[in-house]
Amino acid sequence: SPHKPEAAVYYLTELVKGGKMTAEEAERTEVYMIFRNARRMQDLQDVEGLSEEDRRAYMKKKRELRGNPLVEYANRCGFTLERAKELMDLMHDSDKGTSYYGKTRHHG
């Protein structure tokens, strides 16, 4: 899956070309991916030199603070949850968006 921003940009371009995503959606998504990548780098720096156990605990705490990735993506990009879910599924060629969507409170 396209975790590196460079790979992601190519991927987003393809989705726009295929008419699956608008240029604006791709742009917002790219900005979000760059933000996430930078944050991840920061996390990795923060846990440097920690024991495996402490590292796991730290990452778990961070995930809890950040909450549902789909909700964060939607909020940061100004998408509806439904649209964010569709875009996430497209980008991951899977139902990752759908599975996060199932975990959002307003659903079910």
Describe each region flagged by the PLM:
Residues 1-108:
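Mature extracytoplasmic/periplasmic regions of secreted or cell-envelope proteins
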